[in-house]
């Protein structure tokens, strides 16, 4: 099973809490995390893009780096680990993304890929006059299909003459173009999975619940059904947060502390912003992100326990049919990657060290 790290491009990582580690994003922090991940054999590092935060007492995600420029820097200071940047497709034309991808591939040949997001938080785009209107919630995958068609044309052949509703190319050219650039999509609605099965190489989905490592299995089954219609091989990666310590009790105490300190103002903003997109269907990511059960870490699957318990749950994840790997966040990234590499991974049967 492959393992990746979802690096903290925004302040405080993925914990919307006053009692979790508080920190600002920086290149040095993410370099330390990514180089440490590479040292311990992690397969890839991915950064998100976030253009407006949730506010609150912790100013959650009000402070963010930019994904492509950060990953270009990390590409230059690593040698093996794969590097994925995220593009908010409403903000950068596909021809420019293709040229940026070509440039980063020149820095790290064969190691770079792109994560495509349609955009669901209206405030991110309306603040700069780029929000296309409420129809985007229902038409976004049509937009993304055109966007990706142009991007793939340019990445694979260096030329695009695509003519569509949203994009019109006129002998558009990008050279040099990389030999291979993997594409990721994180949509989990039926429409999102259908898009992924048609255009992407990897699907990223949220794990579910606390210490319920296989609860996401239905997403894999839905992706498999979608891929069967397109005849393409699309690999599934699942997002989890790891909160580990020497004992189950110590780890659970940390988790409870973070939950007790939840930043309610920021969580209220998240709920407000997610509501319009959630109307698109109960299987959308935003419906899960804002659910009250564990909004303190955006309701991603959470693994809490001793190093032995985490290793056991990781192996359970690996047994779910269709799972190619996991994408991990940590409450404390520097210590978390260190502990994973030295204390968890060696115990895993699903990794080379196990």
Swiss-Prot record:
It catalyses: uracil + FMNH2 + NADH + O2 = (Z)-3-ureidoacrylate + FMN + NAD(+) + H2O + H(+); thymine + FMNH2 + NADH + O2 = (Z)-2-methylureidoacrylate + FMN + NAD(+) + H2O + H(+). Its EC number is 1.14.99.46. FMN binds at residues 49-50, 115, 124, 140-141, 189. InterPro entries: Luciferase-like_dom, Luciferase-like_sf, Pyrimidine_monooxygenase_RutA, SsuD_RutA_monooxygenase. Keywords: Flavoprotein, FMN, Monooxygenase, NADP, Oxidoreductase. The keyword Transferase does not apply. Coiled coil: none annotated. GO terms for molecular function: alkanesulfonate monooxygenase activity; monooxygenase activity; uracil oxygenase activity. The keyword Flavoprotein applies. GO terms for biological process: alkanesulfonate catabolic process; nitrogen utilization; uracil catabolic process. The FMN-N(5)-oxide reacts spontaneously with NADH to produce FMN. Requires the flavin reductase RutF to regenerate FMN in vivo. Belongs to the NtaA/SnaA/DszA monooxygenase family. RutA subfamily. HAMAP family: RutA. This is Pyrimidine monooxygenase RutA. The lineage of its organism: Bacteria, Pseudomonadati, Pseudomonadota, Alphaproteobacteria, Caulobacterales.
């Amino acid at each position: 099973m492959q393992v990746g790290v979802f690096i903290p491009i925004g302040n405080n990582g993925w914990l919307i809490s006053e009692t979790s580690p508080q920190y600002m994003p920086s290149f040095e922090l993410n370099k330390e995390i990514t180089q440490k991940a590479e040292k311990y054999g992690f397969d890839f590092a991915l950064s998100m893009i976030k253009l407006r935060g949730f506010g609150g007492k912790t100013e959650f995600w009000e402070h963010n780096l930019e994904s492509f420029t950060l990953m270009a820097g990390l590409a230059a200071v690593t040698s093996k680990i794969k590097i994925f940047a995220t593009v908010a497709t409403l903000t950068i034309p596909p021809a420019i993304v293709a040229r940026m991808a070509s440039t980063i591939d020149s820095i790290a040949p064969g190691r770079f890929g792109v994560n495509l997001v349609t955009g669901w938080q209206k405030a991110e785009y309306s603040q700069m006059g780029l929000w296309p209107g409420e129809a985007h919630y229902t038409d976004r995958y049509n937009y993304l299909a055109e966007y990706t068609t142009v991007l793939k044309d340019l990445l694979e052949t260096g030329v695009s003459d695509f003519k569509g509703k949203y994009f019109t190319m006129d002998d558009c050219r990008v050279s040099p173009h990389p030999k291979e650039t993997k594409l990721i999509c994180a949509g989990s609605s039926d429409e999102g999975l259908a898009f992924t099965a048609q255009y992407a190489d990897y699907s990223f989905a949220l794990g579910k619940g606390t210490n319920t490592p296989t609860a996401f299995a239905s997403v894999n089954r839905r992706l498999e059904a979608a891929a069967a219609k397109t005849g393409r091989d699309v690999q599934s990666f699942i997002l989890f947060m790891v909160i580990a310590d020497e004992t189950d009790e110590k780890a659970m105490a940390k988790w409870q502390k973070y939950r007790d300190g939840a930043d309610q103002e920021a969580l209220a903003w998240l709920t407000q912003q997610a509501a319009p997109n959630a109307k698109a269907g109960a299987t959308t990511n935003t419906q899960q992100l804002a659910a009250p059960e564990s909004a303190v870490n955006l309701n991603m699957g959470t693994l809490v326990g001793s190093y032995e318990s985490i290793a056991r749950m990781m192996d359970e994840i690996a047994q779910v049919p269709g799972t190619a790997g996991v994408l991990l966040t940590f409450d404390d990234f520097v210590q978390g990657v260190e502990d994973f590499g030295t204390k968890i991974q060696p115990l895993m049967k699903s990794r080379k060290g196990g």
